[in-house]
């Protein structure tokens, strides 16, 4: 079964979701640009500490008394007032957003995008000035890698950047584009925070108050052309095909371990992941599909049309 659309997705709510249980992505675009919103299941702000803020046992008991009396409004008010001082000291956070921009004037026609539910693969096809393009994306659990490809009948140039989340910088070592990030140490944003109330994330220079480090690596394979590093990312010039293999790791080492002083080194974990992605892209895809289809325990069918 496939989800098929004949129009681009312009916002993330219309994106195709992809993931492998640890790495997640939302893929959307319009033929002139593509966006990959990325996350990873261990990316949290904060660090181990006293989890009790705001609402306490006494507040709950007081609300219980009101509720038993049928005074539900008063019970709700008690809980809401207690929540006003509660802090979200540990919040699930995104990795960031990778953006792919096509250079030059584009004239898009015959746009088609689909999410194949039987292979967990997203595909986009269209024509630019009459020349065929195909985008493909999947997220492998066996190899722990997100693969994104563009193939075309003509040479094209794209600019790739990363922003959002808590990314702090990027670098190019001649082979790998590396994205680095640092989670906040604590969030001073109350549960009942209102927009513009001055609350903010806390970034401390004290190692004991630092948040979790994280990193993403992107390895490129191209047909023709060249890859040129830029201040914000990379530029792939006059290529006919490009494959991006994206790896993500955080410093998470357990819920009771400090993510900065006792955490893992993301770079070491990425080196281990890199060793698993040495096979060809088609082998990665077949491996991904084989593992994914082991979970095919149900069948979805369309209702009978009258």
Where would I find each of the regions flagged by the language model?
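Acidic/polar, glycine-enriched structural segments that form the non-catalytic walls/loops
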Residues: 1-301, 305
């Amino acid at each position: 079964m496939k989800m098929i659309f004949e129009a681009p997705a312009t916002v993330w709510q219309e994106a195709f979701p992809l993931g492998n249980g640890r790495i997640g992505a939302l893929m959307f675009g319009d033929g002139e640009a593509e966006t990959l919103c990325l996350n990873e299941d261990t990316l949290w702000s904060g660090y181990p500490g006293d989890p009790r803020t705001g609402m306490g046992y006494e507040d709950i008991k007081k609300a219980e008394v009101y509720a038993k009396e049928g005074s539900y409004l008063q019970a709700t008010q008690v809980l809401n007032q207690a929540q006003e001082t509660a802090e979200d000291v540990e919040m699930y956070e995104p990795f960031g957003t990778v953006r792919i921009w096509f250079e030059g004037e584009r004239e898009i026609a015959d746009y088609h995008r689909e999410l194949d539910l039987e292979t967990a693969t997203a595909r986009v096809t269209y024509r630019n000035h009459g020349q065929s393009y195909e985008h493909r994306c999947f997220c492998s659990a066996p190899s722990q890698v997100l693969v994104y490809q563009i193939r075309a009948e003509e040479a094209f140039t794209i600019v790739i950047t990363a922003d959002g989340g808590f990314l702090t910088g990027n670098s190019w070592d001649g082979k790998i584009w590396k994205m680095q990030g640092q989670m906040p140490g604590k969030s001073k944003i109350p549960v009942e925070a209102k927009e513009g109330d001055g609350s903010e994330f806390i970034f401390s220079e004290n190692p004991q108050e630092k948040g979790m480090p994280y990193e993403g690596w992107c390895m490129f394979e191209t047909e023709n052309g060249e890859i040129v590093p830029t201040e914000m990312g990379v530029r792939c010039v006059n290529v006919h095909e490009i494959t991006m293999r994206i790896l993500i790791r955080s410093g998470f080492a357990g819920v009771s371990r400090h993510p900065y002083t006792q955490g893992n080194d993301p770079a070491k974990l990425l080196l281990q992941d890199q060793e698993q992605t040495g096979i060809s892209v088609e082998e990665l895809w077949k491996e991904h599909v084989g593992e994914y289809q082991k979970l095919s325990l149900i069948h979805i069918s369309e209702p009978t049309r009258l």
